[in-house]
A protein has these predicted regions:
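Juxtamembrane "pre-transmembrane" interface segments
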Residues: 179-183, 191, 260-263, 274-348, ...
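Cytosolic juxtamembrane regions of multi-pass inner-membrane proteins
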Residues: 312, 328, 332-336, 353-355, ...
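Beta-strand-rich non-transmembrane domains
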Residues: 79-84, 158-283, 287-288, 675, ...
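Transmembrane helices with small-residue packing motifs
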Residues: 10, 17-53, 111-120, 379, ...
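C-terminal transmembrane helical bundles of large multi-pass transporters
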Residues: 324, 641-1009
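Signature of alpha-helical transmembrane segments and their immediate interfacial
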Residues: 1-32, 432, 500-553, 669, ...
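Solvent-exposed, membrane-proximal periplasmic/extracellular interface segments of envelope transport
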Residues: 56-133, 195-216, 237, 574-663, ...
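Interfacial segments of transmembrane alpha-helices in multi-pass membrane proteins
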Residues: 2-9, 291, 296, 329-386, ...
Length: 1011
């Protein structure tokens, strides 16, 4: 087969061109995303009930939903959180379960649970988590003229954003929807003239009745007139402020208009939440990308639209923040840059080792064609370009060059021994094809168990496994197809291989001269090598225990989310003022910030729900160091000025965090009452104080308390003074501007018409207030009694019922010690019990699973090697080197301060598949030489000399191909850093072991049988 190829160079060239054309066409159509598009096994149920407290939401709504939803199949965990005005149920399912069936089942169970609710309650909103839930970016719209920013202009800007900006954004084909928050809405406030009403013997209820009666709609009525039928319409509706003012009513025998008895004015509704960007009140829009849209196209269209907005609306300021496309571009560009640098380093290595200019040119031809063929396979197998698949390409690049080096080196050796060039090209390629195929299979075998990892991690790294497999197969095809043909064409006019005179002077090939002497030294002092082997066996377990276990490596970021719960009943204006006060402390450190205070209006769950006393501040700094400094100093400033506040910081959300739930706290202690009842505030406060005393080095936040005023009526006095409960409720609603008469439709929203007498202070709500009855005016303070209570602001519950979640930010051995201390203190109190969850446990489960993957991978390698060598002994010789290699990897991780995480473990697994390739070639060569009659020791020395240059070259090219990932700075490089560190340290140790330890082990085993 290979002989026919060398004689048909034009046919081979045409095949290459066809592959490149198809591959380039496939690249243009491949989707580009940050991570692979996979299903996320999460469903959220959002409950809304504006008039209910957190306790009522939990007891009356979430408890019934929870009892139904815990029965859903494949449920992994359920967390219910109740707060004033609503609640959220987050369900996580086993990966691989039928998401469509589960979604239908959840809807049916929600309908079953809500059948007993009050008819006025809204049906809960159910949403499936998706990779597109993370906005591509946020757009802040604010007024440029801050000095003349008034309530009217802000209302106009809000209406303009809702009516115009969002619709123009949603018209883009790449945009699925625009989620918006920070909107301001108007209302009509009717302030009755109570003196006039009392003078004519009426109250404010007469005004509300008149307005409701004036807003009449007959509905669908028609009347017949001869042969025709006409619709009947009744023109009596209230749609403007003037309509309300001109409503007629009859009181005390006279007719009045509303404007005669009350003042009607249009004003802004009471703020429940607010957003400011760099000190300006703004409207924020989250742009959600369609799942099949390309990020680059979306960014280009948005940039064009932003330029048009700034030109058409000069009074408005448009700002793009939290740009996921920037993260994608930066990560992808760095990955591509690292890929190119890796290829360049590989060519430099070949340039110096092969000592001429033509051999690197062969590799330069092979690498691009193999990469383009790989992208063609990507397109066929529906694999996107993302940081995972690109990292697989980079891993495969080093091994891709290995095949080319081995083929070129073997052809050159046979040619130098006197074989004709064509025969050297044909038989040199044919000789190494079988061991190269075995190397590809062993490497692919390493990745097969990664595909079967449970959960999202297995699905995510399917792309990496497939990318490496595709790259290796493509490289093998191109190596045997291209190199013999073009090698023959490049050198056919030369009698033999002649190194370039200039390069041979600076060649590193002279380093091989001392190989025989070093190997002979190890043969004489075999105890040194066996001592290293024994020490590695003993110390692997010690290093494994000492290394911290994490799910993911620490990813650098230049932005953050600062979460604050003030733990005080402050108004939204004070909340915003405090946020601005914090940001004023960092004038030169922060590039931009967006403060979201109070409740937000987003429909999707990309931004967590917040209450009136909570704030989320997004901060973008110039560098990783600046953001670390900001987080540290901001926390200190908040602690000094507002000691009751609870605060935390986290990286700004991206799809990678969403997939791996990296925001999960290290340890969460779920403290609950032994009898299942609600924890008493005083008991919980005392318990947390004891924990702070016992764990001074651990930050234990204050409980988030919700203080409220409780009004208790006196039924006996209500009956005595002939006052109904509805009268008291109506008065309180009017006093707090909460008595809604009707809602006027304004298209996509409705404007409430409210009757009120102006908001009152809490101290004036009862004292000095009266209710008019038929018997006269009754002081409200003799009918009501006021008390103040407190309860948890957020009430958490799960499968085991209600609990208090205590977050402990501790890692490693400190986590185990902290849990022992907490358990001892909590269980000493007969009222409480505790259980634990958090990333501390999930990380260890994942590491155990990866260790199982490593064992399975080594077993697969053993089976493949045993089949290849037809021996049960030689696989042990090759695989024994993994002991020293794994010890070297763990030692380097420990010295560099890295943890044992998903990426470092995958690097270790991949290293096991790559590092034995050199040993496979060496053992195969030793076997061939022994079959030709060489003695054992001579065969070992000869095989070492023949393969030394190829082994060093392949190791160096693999190491240098992934060396660019040792430079951190973006998410892609940070993610690949521990993988690269593990792979490089393993390859360095593996090269030493392949060159010196494997020949020694081969000699020790076969010296007795050698004749």
């Amino acid at each position: 087969m290979f002989k026919g190829l060398t004689r048909r160079p034009i046919a081979v060239l045409m095949v290459l061109i066809a592959v490149m054309v198809l591959g380039i066409a496939a690249i243009r159509k491949l989707p580009v995303s940050l991570v692979p598009d996979i299903n996320i096994p999460q469903i959220t149920v959002q409950v809304t009930s504006p008039d209910r407290s957190a306790r009522e939401v939990n007891d009356l709504m979430l408890s019934s939903l929870r009892s139904q939803l815990v029965q859903v199949p494949h449920l992994k965990d359920i967390v219910c959180t109740a707060r004033d005005g609503g609640g959220l149920i987050e369900m996580t399912f086993d990966y691989g379960a039928d998401a469509d069936y589960i979604f239908i089942d959840v809807n049916e169970r929600v309908d079953r649970a809500t059948s007993g609710w009050d008819a006025r309650e809204e049906r809960p909103m159910i949403a499936r988590a998706s990779a597109t839930d993370i906005p591509a970016f946020f757009i802040n719209v604010s007024l440029k003229d801050i000095e003349h920013t008034g309530g009217t202009r802000l209302l106009e800007m809000s209406d303009f954003c809702r009516q115009v900006i969002t619709r123009r954004l949603e018209q883009l084909p790449q945009v699925a929807m625009v989620d918006i928050s920070g909107l301001l809405y108007p209302q009509l406030l009717i302030i009755p003239d109570m003196e006039k009403l009392r003078a004519i013997g009426a109250d404010e209820t007469a005004l509300s009745s008149a307005i409701r009666n004036a807003n009449v709609s007959l509905g669908s009525l028609s009347i017949r007139d001869g042969e025709y039928r006409f619709d009947v319409r009744f023109e009596s509706s209230v749609v403007t402020r003037e309509d309300v003012e001109n409503v007629w009513l009859k009181l005390g025998g006279r007719t009045y208009q509303i404007k005669d008895l009350a003042q009607v004015r249009e004003e802004q509704q009471r703020l429940k939440g607010m957003i400011t960007a760099d000190g300006r009140q703004c409207v924020t829009m989250a742009v959600i990308k369609r799942s099949d849209a390309r990020m680059a196209e979306l960014r280009d269209e948005i940039e064009k639209l932003m330029a048009a907005f700034e030109r058409d609306y000069p009074d408005l300021n448009f700002q793009i923040t939290r740009d996921q496309t920037e993260l994608l571009d930066y990560s992808i560009n760095n990955m591509v840059k690292n890929l190119l640098f890796g290829a360049l380093f590989a060519c430099i290595i070949i340039f110096f080792f092969m000592q001429d200019f033509r051999s690197p040119l062969l590799v330069v031809i092979t690498i691009p064609t193999a990469l383009i063929l790989s992208f063609l396979f990507f397109y066929v197998l529906h694999i996107s370009i993302n940081i995972i698949s690109l990292s697989g390409l980079v891993l495969g690049l080093g091994m891709m060059v290995d095949n080319s080096i081995i083929t070129i080196d073997n052809i050159t050796q046979r040619w130098n021994k006197g074989e004709p060039l064509e025969d050297a090209c044909v038989y040199g390629t044919q000789e190494v094809f079988t061991p190269m195929l075995s190397s590809v299979l062993t490497t692919c075998a390493i990745f097969i168990p990664l595909i079967f990892m449970s959960g999202i991690a297995g699905a995510l790294f399917y792309d990496e496994a497939m990318a490496v497999t595709i790259t290796l197969i493509s490289a093998l095809i191109m190596s045997v197809l291209v190199i013999p043909v073009f090698y023959y064409r490049f050198y056919r006019n030369q009698p033999c291989f002649t190194p370039n005179r200039f390069i041979s002077r600076i060649s590193v090939g002279n380093m091989t001269r001392g190989y025989d002497a070093i190997l002979s030294w190890f043969f004489r002092r075999r105890g040194v090598m066996w001592g290293i082997f024994g020490a590695a066996v003993l110390l692997i377990g010690v290093l494994f225990i000492k290394l911290d276990k994490q799910k993911l490596p620490t990813l650098s970021h230049s932005d953050t989310l600062l979460n604050i719960e003030w733990n005080e009943r402050i108004p939204i204006e004070e909340n915003g003022r405090r946020c601005e006060q914090i940001m004023a402390q960092f004038p030169g450190m922060v590039e931009q910030y967006t403060a979201m205070t109070g409740a937000q209006q987003f429909a999707l769950s990309h931004t967590r729900e917040t209450g009136l006393s909570e704030a989320i501040i997004y901060v973008k700094a110039g560098s990783t160091g600046d953001i670390d400094r900001f987080e540290r100093e901001a926390r200190d400033y908040i602690t000094r000025n507002w000691p009751e506040a609870v605060h935390s910081s986290q990286a700004s959300g991206n799809i990678f965090d969403m997939l791996f739930q990296d925001r999960e706290a290290p340890v969460v202690a779920r403290i609950k009452r032994t009898d299942g009842s609600t924890p008493e505030p005083d008991q919980l406060t005392t318990l947390l104080y004891q924990l702070r005393e016992a764990l001074p080095q651990v930050y234990i936040p204050q409980p988030e308390w919700n203080e409220y005023i409780e009004l208790i009526t006196d039924p006996e006095r209500l009956a005595l003074y002939d006052v109904s409960f509805d009268q008291i409720l109506s008065y309180l609603q009017n006093a707090m501007n909460a008595s809604s008469v009707l809602r006027i439709s304004k298209g996509d929203f409705s404007m409430p018409v409210v009757i009120g007498v102006g908001t009152k202070e809490a101290k004036d709500l009862i004292q000095g207030s009266y209710i008019d009855t038929r018997g006269g005016r009754v002081p409200l303070e003799i009918l009501l009694k006021e008390t103040r209570n407190r309860d948890l602001k957020q009430i958490a519950s799960g499968v085991d019922g209600e609990y208090y979640p205590l977050v402990l930010d501790v890692k490693g051995r400190r986590a185990r010690q902290a849990m022992e201390t907490v358990s001892k203190i909590v269980r000493a109190d007969d009222y409480f019990d505790v259980s634990y969850t958090g990333s501390y446990f999930t990380n260890r489960e994942m590491i155990k699973e990866l260790c199982s993957v490593l064992v399975i991978s080594i077993l697969l390698l053993f089976f493949i090697l045993a089949a290849q060598f037809e021996s049960l002994v030689q696989p042990f010789i090759i695989l024994s080197e993994l002991i020293i290699d794994i010890f070297a990897v763990l030692g380097v991780l420990w010295l560099c301060g890295e943890s044992l995480n998903l990426m470092s473990m995958i690097g270790m697994v991949v290293m096991c598949g790559i590092v034995i390739n050199d040993s496979i070639l060496k053992v195969d060569t030793i076997n061939r030489l022994r079959e030709k009659g060489y003695g054992l020791k001579r065969a070992i020395l000869e095989a070492g000399s023949r393969r030394l240059k190829a082994i060093i070259m392949t190791s160096l090219t693999t190491i240098l191909a992934i060396a660019p990932f040792l430079v951190r700075g973006d998410m892609g490089s940070d993610l690949q850093y521990p993988l690269s560190l593990a792979l490089i340290s393993g390859m360095v140790a593996g090269t030493f072991v392949s060159v010196f330890f494997v020949p020694l082990a081969y000699y020790v085993i076969y010296k007795r049988t050698d004749r």
